[in-house]
């Protein structure tokens, strides 16, 4: 394992870099040459720091210190499964271990086995050649094994490392001694108050092997989870209302609940829901060893606040009366059962009788297996009433496909729209990639089930970003002679 030694001085906005030793610890000797060239770092007597070919004046803020030291383009030059020996502004020392493959971040305060080496190294000619005057606050030839509470310093190290490793915007880093205010802390921690297991980041200290999360920290995060949402691609934070669940850092489209989509499309105060009290009665008495179907329904209802996986109703879109159905993937994967099929069927029949344009927003994993053939019947039932709506009444139906739209929904009303619109990067398929590969024993080309690929093959009419969707729908309706109500 490679050993490296740094001296970080964060007090009064000053930072000092003393070099990296690339050989094993047992091969260290006083006065060995460091592997970092002097051209890359300049340290003058006025405590001005320059580096990475940027010869501009160095700011005194903590965040700029970190930006200059661990920029995203240079982080891999000195972080590669290394142990860093760090001394803070209080002249207390500890080691920081990074393992990129196993995603481990480890801190050790025990220096009993290293004390002899550090004493020898700090007394070497390399350090003695530097100024030892009274004004040189950085000089300390002795490194002691102290019980220093390094929580705040751990926070800054986590901030600087992970922000550089995943290229987080500098503006999010807050110069604060409060661990709860750390941006990195908020996005590493999930809403359940545990370390995100999707990336398997393990943040611990050797002293207690416990994570750095308390119930108080979790409460602070929970207070604002209705305002901010975390990107599941780059783990950045964004403001819900402004960004429409689209990550401003990587452009990733996050899932939206049915209520959020209704709020996005329907004018405020005009939404009138339909059939809200319709619930599944477990028609085939589906038996499961893991969890009974009724229990799964109850759990999904408590989690989402919905009775089933679709919301239907009427409202106005830029003043134009419309019938709208929105599926919610949070409710058992948006699966289509008897309740979903019946609610959509009733919505289409109402739109037919009232001569309303129809919008169905699809987000589903397909037919609900817990209801057997009854769920498959919904495909034919919805398609039948759509045929009357489109062919007999000559009314206008727009299908909006979001990620994911698969299975029975794709094979029925999802692809029956007069205009079929998809969101960018939406996953749209009949059978999933894994099912196809296991059945046909062939690899599915990457991106072949994405909206962009389907558009090129003529299966979609348009791909419309969320921020433009309402305006595009309004223009399409007016093109087909559906105009806003006269408000005079």
UniProtKB/Swiss-Prot annotation:
HAMAP family: AcetylCoA_CT_beta. A zinc finger (C4-type) spans 231-250. It catalyses: N(6)-carboxybiotinyl-L-lysyl-[protein] + acetyl-CoA = N(6)-biotinyl-L-lysyl-[protein] + malonyl-CoA. It is found in: Plastid, Chloroplast membrane; Plastid, Chloroplast stroma. It comes from Arabidopsis thaliana (Mouse-ear cress). Zn(2+) binds at residues 231, 234, 247, 250. This is Acetyl-coenzyme A carboxylase carboxyl transferase subunit beta, chloroplastic. Acetyl-CoA carboxylase is a heterohexamer composed of biotin carboxyl carrier protein, biotin carboxylase and 2 subunits each of ACCase subunit alpha and ACCase plastid-coded subunit beta (accD). One of its GO terms (biological process) is fatty acid biosynthetic process. Binds 1 zinc ion per subunit. Its cofactor is Zn(2+). Accumulates in fatty acids synthesizing tissues such as embryos, expanding leaves, flower buds, flowers, and developing siliques. Keywords: ATP-binding, Chloroplast, Fatty acid biosynthesis, Fatty acid metabolism, Lipid biosynthesis, Lipid metabolism, Membrane, Metal-binding, Nucleotide-binding, Plastid, Transferase, Zinc, Zinc-finger. Pathway: Lipid metabolism; malonyl-CoA biosynthesis; malonyl-CoA from acetyl-CoA: step 1/1. Its EC number is 2.1.3.15. GO terms for cellular component: acetyl-CoA carboxylase complex; chloroplast membrane; chloroplast stroma.
